[in-house]
Regions:
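Alpha-helical transmembrane segments in inner-membrane proteins
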Residues: 1-339
Length: 339
């Protein structure tokens, strides 16, 4: 099979997967709806007020948000893997998501205890500040630690520290307005509104576009810093852009849905295997589609498996994502043993 044909079929499969899973997310849930009822609601012809409300105000904005944030999380993972040259680097593993989680939790508690509301912009700014703080610590450690495995362990430890402090904050937050804080801290797409969708789109879409524009220098950077410099890539500025974009994308996800594990690690590798190519120009769009499809599937399971009880999204992503990480580690160790 030629490369072009394989890429075309892979993109077609990913796009079809997103479309099918998006539709299923509108049909299934604690209240199942027929395709006709969903279509009528989308076309403005629905006569069942309850069905129209469920589709247009609950499931549709949630599904759109899952697509946006799934794409953002997968792309963030790919950018971090490129920056650290490590296949298991990701927002959750490197502590970036946990830093954002802590900052958002503190912001929500402080604002709500003062009787103030937290808008989307406030949450995104807080999450970005937290993610950058965690990333800064990881970068400081990276200068002192030559082995990437130790750096990953440090990132995991940062995540544990931030998660522990967040759990303490959530435990002692005695305010009736922050009932959903615990669910958010576990990872959840519930409660998404069209205002949330608009705010997330204003951050995610430009960031993804900027990442795509960096595809060519990214390919050179993956060959090594020396090679990148030899072909004219401003390595320092490029590295800074990778850090900022990955942190911003991960922060936006955490601000709205809480920390979501393993998506940023697993999806880029699954996409590269599906595409049969490691070129960023091909992998980045594939990551966006793959991340959207993966999160749509996991959210559908989280909502429907034990309906009306909803599982945390991280619980489901971990079930599917963790085996991929184990497979990566085993394959890498096997390859090193052969060499």
């Amino acid at each position: 099979m030629t490369t072009t044909r394989r890429l075309s079929l892979a993109y077609l499969a990913l796009t079809a997967g997103v479309a099918v899973l998006f539709a299923l997310n509108l049909f299934w849930g604690s209240v199942s709806l027929t395709p006709g009822a969903v279509a009528a609601a989308l076309l403005g012809r629905g006569e069942d007020v309850l069905a129209v409300g469920i589709v247009l105000q609950l499931r549709l904005p949630r599904a759109v948000m899952v697509v946006l944030l799934g794409a953002a999380l997968s792309a963030a993972g790919y950018l971090l893997q490129t920056f650290f040259a490590n296949p298991i680097a990701g927002p959750f593993v490197m502590g970036v998501s946990s830093g954002a989680k802590l900052a958002v939790a503190l912001t929500m508690v402080v604002f709500l205890q003062q009787g103030l509301l937290t808008g989307s912009a406030t949450l995104i700014i807080a999450a970005f500040a937290g993610s950058m703080a965690a990333m800064a610590f990881v970068l400081v450690v990276a200068r002192r630690v030559p082995r990437m495995s130790i750096l990953v362990i440090c990132g995991i430890m940062i995540g544990y520290i931030c998660s522990a402090v967040t759990d303490i904050v959530v435990t002692f937050a005695q305010d009736s307005n922050i009932v959903n804080l615990h669910n958010w801290s576990m990872g959840s797409f519930s409660g998404m509104t069209w205002a949330n969708v608009g705010a997330a789109a204003c951050v995610v879409l430009p960031a993804l576009a900027a990442a795509f524009l960096l595809s060519k220098p990214m390919a050179a950077y993956q060959m090594g810093e020396s090679y990148a410099k030899s072909v004219g890539v401003p390595v320092r500025a490029f590295s800074t852009a990778l850090v900022l974009l990955s942190s911003l994308l991960a922060a936006c996800v955490t601000a709205f849905a809480g920390p979501i594990s393993f998506v940023g690690i697993a999806v880029p590798h699954l996409v590269k295997n599906l595409l049969g190519s490691a070129k960023p120009l091909y992998v980045l769009p594939g990551c966006c589609l793959g991340g959207a499809a993966f999160c749509l599937l996991c959210d559908l399971i989280a909502r429907s498996l034990f309906a009306p009880t909803e599982l945390s999204i991280s619980s489901v992503t971990a079930v599917f994502g963790a085996p991929v990480v184990i497979w990566l580690l085993v394959r890498r160790q096997t390859q090193e043993g052969r060499e």
